[in-house]
Curated annotation (Swiss-Prot):
Protein's organism: Thermotoga petrophila (strain ATCC BAA-488 / DSM 13995 / JCM 10881 / RKU-1)
Function recorded in the entry: Catalyzes the conversion of dethiobiotin (DTB) to biotin by the insertion of a sulfur atom into dethiobiotin via a radical-based mechanism.
Binding site for [4Fe-4S] cluster: C40, C44, C47
CDD domains: Radical_SAM
Family note: Belongs to the radical SAM superfamily. Biotin synthase family.
Protein name: Biotin synthase
PROSITE patterns: RADICAL_SAM
Residues that coordinate or bind [2Fe-2S] cluster: C116, C176, K247
Length: 299
């Protein structure tokens, strides 16, 4: 199927096609910790952590290993198999990278979780060092298409992000990379992003839907409706194929009663336990959803 043909498919047809491609996939749950908050000089217009916007976000330096382990233990209790260390800012200092490496070692010794990290722009030698200390997967979103990127960020480029993904692939780390939707882009932008992620051979693609945050330039943006969200997920599954994990992440609670439909439309993973600066769904609600999905999808 030609990529452009996907855009013209009826929603039901697209969902059914995506659903057939997820039949052999397992449910993949992950959780993250906001390990360093605020203090970011980048201008990503959707993000609460940019110091350029007055969002009231908490600001703190890199957490200690005991605090991060506590969050990891909570994630493990919720059934997560992966745990991500996420820091604000374009990149970490060498000193901070050394500290994160020690934290990764500590988590691997005290949990059964696979450890992921999202630390901004890193070079190959830095990523290799983290891998040698136990890092399993690196996360770095491309966010949107190259042509639309300057509408959401001007302090770095789309290709800065691509380079980091390539660096992680080159040192044989697994890679998680996705985007944010509902920031003014169209379906052509989404399709182009999906194609680029496929060509980069990433392992996991998080699908984030904009949660407008007061104080950011996008605070008055309207949230995407459920049908457009479902079409986006299904389109990514059809483009990416059967072997890539697609996770619904930020904004998934806005699906309301239709959240399970995202999994029939191609998703096979989600972030549990909240996001960087916002709470997600409650633990009890997520457990009910997970149990229902496992029964319905035989996960």
């Amino acid at each position: 199927m030609k990529l452009k043909e996907i855009l013209s498919m009826e929603t039901k047809e697209l969902i059914l096609k995506a659903n057939r491609m997820t039949s052999n996939l397992k449910l993949d749950l992950c959780s993250i910790v906001n390990a360093k908050s605020g203090i970011c000089d980048q201008d990503c217009k959707f993000c609460a952590q940019s110091s350029l916007y007055n969002t009231g976000v908490k600001k703190y330096p890199l957490l200690d290993k005991e605090s991060i382990l506590e969050k990891a233990k909570e994630a493990e209790k919720m059934g997560a198999i992966r745990f991500g260390i996420v820091t604000s800012g374009k990149r970490l200092t060498r000193k901070e990278i050394l500290k994160v490496a020690k934290i990764i070692e500590f988590l691997k010794a005290n949990t059964n979780l696979k450890i992921c990290a999202s630390l901004g722009v890193l070079e190959k030698d830095e990523l290799r060092y983290l891998k040698e200390n136990g890092l399993d997967r690196y996360h770095h979103n491309l966010e949107t298409s190259p042509g639309f990127f300057r509408n959401i960020c001007t302090t770095h480029t789309f290709y800065d992000r691509v380079k980091t993904v390539e660096n992680a692939k080159n040192v044989e780390l697994e890679v998680c990379s996705g985007g944010i939707f509902g920031v003014g882009e169209n379906f052509d932008d989404r399709l182009e992003l999906a194609k680029i992620l496929k060509d980069l051979e990433v392992d996991s693609v998080p699908i984030n839907f904009l949660i407008p945050i007061r104080g950011t330039p996008f605070e008055n943006f309207q949230k995407l409706d459920v049908v457009e969200r479902i079409r986006t997920i299904a389109m990514f599954r059809v483009v990416l194929g059967e072997n890539v994990t697609i996770k619904i992440a930020a904004g998934r609670e806005d699906f309301g009663d239709f959240q399970a439909l995202a999994f029939f439309a191609g998703a096979n993973g989600m972030i549990v336990g909240g996001y960087l600066t916002l709470k997600g769904r409650s633990y009890d609600d997520d457990i009910k959803l997970i149990e229902g999905l496992r029964e319905l999808m035989r996960w």
